[in-house]
Each structure stands twice: as C-alpha cells, then as structure tokens.
A protein has these predicted regions:
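Conserved Nudix-box catalytic region and its N-terminal flanking loop in Nudix hydrolases
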Residues: 1-45
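A short coil-to-beta-strand element that immediately follows conserved catalytic motifs
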Residues: 46-55, 124-131
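ATP-binding pocket architecture of kinase catalytic cores
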Residues: 59-60, 64-95, 129-233
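Juxta-kinase regulatory segment immediately upstream of eukaryotic protein kinase catalytic domains
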Residues: 81-129
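Active-site acidic catalytic loop and adjacent metal/ATP-binding pocket
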Residues: 130-146, 151-152, 180, 268-316
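A cross-family kinase active-site recognition segment
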Residues: 199-260, 278-280, 308-309, 355, ...
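All-alpha amphipathic helical-bundle segments outside canonical DNA-binding/catalytic cores
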Residues: 230-231, 344-358
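Active-site activation/catalytic loop segments of kinase-like enzymes and analogous catalytic loops
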Residues: 312-344, 357-376, 389-393
Length: 401
C-alpha cells in the first residue's frame, strides 16, 4: 500500500493543526526527507520531523498511514492546517526515554555543534541542513559545504560511540571506514562516500569487504589497549548470561514453554564456539551489505552503532544472511579463509555453523535493548523482534540436525 503521512504541526509550544494524509514515494517510516520537503512546500516555512506518533497498517518499519510530530520553525500563514482535536498533553508532555533529536531544542543544539565543528575544520556550511532520517536509533542530516556534503549522525545512549570505533579501525585500515570530520558524545560528522549500498554487489567486493574487516579485527585483537573505552561486552560468558536473563523476562510470555526451554538449551553452544579459537575483538555488530558503501572499488563500512567487544563470527554470519542466496557462499568462503590464515589451528568454518543459532539469540538481546531504551510511541519499530529472533534461532538449530 506504500506510505501515506499525516503531520501534527506545532510552533513553539502552540499546536497549530494537522496536514494530511498525503502520499510519499519512500515506504520506510524513518525516511523523513520527503515528508519534510512536502510540508515545507505546503506551509512555506522550514520544518523538522521530530518523531513518529502512531502507525495504522504497515509493518516491518514501512508502509501504512504514519503520523508524525512536526515542528515548524516559523509560524505558517493561517488556513493551511486542519484544526483536528488531538491529545495535546501527550504531544508535548515529558517522556524520559525520548531521544534528544525528537525535541526541537535537541535538533537545534546538535546542528549548532555541527556548524561550529565544520567551521573549525574549514568546511563551513553553505546552506540549511537537510533532515534525511529520524527514528529511535539515529538521526541523520545532510549538511552542504563548499567541499561537498557532510553527514551528521546522532545516536542514543545505548549505541556504541561511533567516532571512537571508526577511529580504532582507521588506524589499521583507513579505507575501511568513512572519513571523520568531527566527533562528540553520541554524534559524528562523516565525509560523503560516493557510490551505492552493496545489497547486490559483485563477488569481488563481497570478498574484499569481508576479508578486510577480518584482517583489521585480527590486528585489533592483538592490541587490546587500542580498543575504544566503554565498548559493550559481548564475550561469550557475558552474552550467554544476557540471553538467559532475556528468557527470564517478558519475552517469555510471547513464546511457548517449549520454545523457551529449547532456546535455553542453545546456550550450551557457547563453550563449543570458544573451542574454535577465534579471538575476541572489535565487532561491527550489523555487518550486512546495506552497511557497505562502494563506487566499484573497495567498500567502506558504515553504521558502527552496534559495535562491541566479542566474537567476530557474528559479522561473518550477518554478511551471509543478508546477501542473495547465490552470493552467500562467496562471503562464507572469504570469511573462513581470512580467519584460517590468521589463527593457526582455529576452526572458523565450524564456528560459523555453531554460531548460526547463537547469532539470532544475540540479536534478540540487542532488540530488547532497543525496546528498553526508547519511548512508547516508537516501540512499533521493534515490538515482537526479540521473540522473532529467538524463533529464528530455533529454526536455525532445527535445520542443522
């Protein structure tokens, strides 16, 4: 059905009215650039989309009738908005888990920081910021400069510090990561990477991306002092305990008793994974090809918000899972060869098989962290994901029998 949009518009503390519904060309809820562009045209004032309020229909973060809270920076001319009754107290009321960029003052603050940081770096902005994406996991703005666009990304408190993670990898392989122009707490300014995301890329780029990440991870595993401080710990004893705690929590009510018991049984695989000899290192955490960027040459890896310290097998599996079926063997072979050449006596092929169900359980923990860290109206992005990931783990284990 695609995505249709309604916008609840405020100016300062004043509720002005509603615009919509109107269609937009991109189905994904977090992609707000076409929403803001339509509203600027209709209202003839600059606006920012603050947050999602509700969704009717749609699933998986796309499609349906989506309602957003939108802040106008100037008061629009009268008569442009429909006066519909809404819960104004709920719209403007306090919410402990609200993202800083879901408040107008938070957007203004981070854009001011970005402007100052770019000026200090000799990359002064040449026009207004363009809001590209906003949701509970990040806000992304495109900033025009005389030397090309710069991307401002800001992330929540449960995300890894991308600036320090990228810096760690840049010391080992500068081409593996995007150029960082400036960084601060929960925010980073990145140089533009030409090209495309690598959802359906060539076997050569797949092999290069997988092997270069593994090579960098192997080096960082031997340099623990160079790892960023404050990394989430996902080493096998820790993640095993986190999975057990997850199964003790509310997610159990979404599963049958048999499913919970079977998921607990999978935790015993972690010691077997340790036997494979892979070192703990800096893990990307969401190494699917949509987070690889290439213009035909070696890919740069973006979106390091799920980075952590743990077993790199998670990255090998993520690459395989999201590629077209015919290209998955290339990723698996590249990953196995990369680690086999670096850990004499190790068993990376066995690690991939043992860890396949465990990867799904690890993502179940991560999805629960999302749900625990975001405000209620935005939980629709992730509701049901922990249970779905647990069931995926059970299917994976069953398929291996």
């Amino acid at each position: 059905m695609g995505r249709i949009v309604s916008a609840v518009v405020t100016w300062g503390e004043a509720y002005l009215g509603v615009i919509g519904p109107f269609p937009v060309s991109i189905p994904w809820w977090s992609e707000v650039e076409p929403v803001a562009a339509h509203l600027r045209q209709v209202l003839d004032v600059p606006v920012f989309v603050l947050r999602l309020l509700l969704v009717d229909g749609g699933e998986g973060g796309r499609d349906g009738h989506v309602t957003y809270h939108v802040a106008a920076l100037n008061r629009p001319a009268p008569g442009l908005l429909a006066e519909r009754p809404i819960d104004q107290a709920g719209l403007a009321g306090p919410e402990e888990l609200r993202s800083p960029w879901a408040r107008l003052e938070g957007i203004c603050e981070v854009l001011s920081w970005a402007s100052d940081t770019l000026s200090a770096a000799g990359r002064r902005m040449t026009g207004p910021a363009v809001q590209r994406k906003t949701w509970n996991l990040a806000a992304l703005f495109r900033l025009p400069t005389g030397k090309g666009p710069v991307w401002l990304k800001t992330t929540p408190r449960f995300a890894a510090d991308e600036g320090s993670v990228i810096a760690a990898f840049a010391r080992v392989d500068p081409v593996l990561v995007p150029p960082v122009i400036g960084a601060g707490p929960r925010r980073v300014l990145l140089g533009h990477l030409p090209g495309e995301d690598c959802w359906d890329t060539s076997p050569q780029i797949i092999t290069s991306a997988v092997q270069r990440l593994a090579a960098a991870q192997a080096i960082l595993a031997g340099q623990p002092a160079s790892l960023p401080p404050g990394l989430p710990d996902r080493r096998t004893p820790v993640i095993a305990g986190q999975i057990s705690a997850l199964l003790d929590g509310p997610v159990a009510s979404e599963l049958s008793a048999g499913e919970v018991a079977a998921a607990r049984g999978l935790i015993s695989r972690f010691p077997l994974l340790d036997e494979c000899g892979l070192p703990d290192t800096l893990v990307h955490g969401d190494f699917h090809p949509g987070n690889w960027r290439s213009d035909g040459g070696p890919a740069a890896i973006v979106d390091w918000a799920d980075a952590h310290f743990g077993n790199p097998v998670l990255d090998g599996l993520r690459a395989c899972d999201f590629l077209p079926p015919g290209k998955r063997p290339a990723a698996a072979r590249a990953w196995i060869d990369a680690w086999a050449s670096r850990i004499p006596g190790g068993e990376p092929a066995r690690a991939l098989r043992i860890a396949e169900p465990l990867a799904h359980l690890t993502y179940a923990v991560r999805y629960q962290e999302f749900l625990d860290g975001i405000e209620p109206s935005e939980r629709i992005y992730h509701v049901g994901d922990p249970a779905a990931a647990i069931r995926a783990a059970l299917r994976s284990a069953k398929d291996q029998r």
